[in-house]
Design a protein with these regions (language model features):
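Transition segment at domain starts
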Residues: 29-34, 95
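Bacterial signal peptide processing site
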Residues: 23-26
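Bacterial N-terminal signal peptides that target proteins for export
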Residues: 1-10
C-alpha cells in the first residue's frame, strides 16, 4: 500500500512540475501575446521554407552584426537533420523573461521527430534572437 501511495505522490509531483513548465512568464509592459505569437509563427514559416536571408534581414541591426544568413541556415540544418519535412505546428506559447523581451516557443512536427523554435522579440517587436533545436 505504501508503495502505491509513494507512486501516486511521485506522479502528482511530476505532473505539477510539467504543468508549471507550460505556463509562460508575464510579458514586458506593452507587449501583446497575440502579436508575439503571430510574429514568431511568421519567422518559423520563413525558416521552414529556407528563407534564411529574409530572416537575417529581419534581425535588429546589432543582432545582425553578430550572425549571418549562413549561420541561420546551419542552425536549421543541424536542428532538422534526419527529421524529414515540416508537417505542422504542434503547439505554441509566449513567455516573458527577465530581460525586456518576449519569446515565442513553437513546437513543430516533422516527418520523423519534432523541432522546437524559440524566437525572441524586443518590446518594439524587433527580431532579436533565434534558437532552433531538435526535440
Amino acid at each position: 500500500m505504501r508503495k502505491r501511495e509513494y507512486l501516486i505522490a511521485s506522479l502528482a509531483m511530476l505532473l505539477l512540475l510539467v504543468l508549471s513548465g507550460c505556463k509562460g512568464n508575464k510579458l514586458p509592459d506593452g507587449m501583446d501575446e497575440d502579436k508575439v505569437s503571430s510574429a514568431g509563427l511568421a519567422v518559423m514559416s520563413q525558416l521552414t521554407k529556407g528563407e534564411y536571408e529574409e530572416v537575417y534581414d529581419a534581425l535588429r541591426e546589432d543582432v545582425r552584426e553578430q550572425t549571418s544568413a549562413d549561420a541561420i541556415e546551419e542552425m536549421m540544418d543541424t536542428a532538422t537533420e534526419g527529421r524529414g519535412s515540416f508537417k505542422k505546428v504542434k503547439d505554441s506559447m509566449v513567455t516573458g523573461v527577465t530581460e525586456p523581451h518576449a519569446i515565442a516557443v513553437i513546437g513543430a512536427k516533422y516527418d520523423k521527430k519534432s523541432v522546437v523554435f524559440r524566437i525572441a522579440f524586443d518590446t518594439e517587436m524587433n527580431l532579436i534572437g533565434l534558437d532552433v533545436r531538435g526535440k
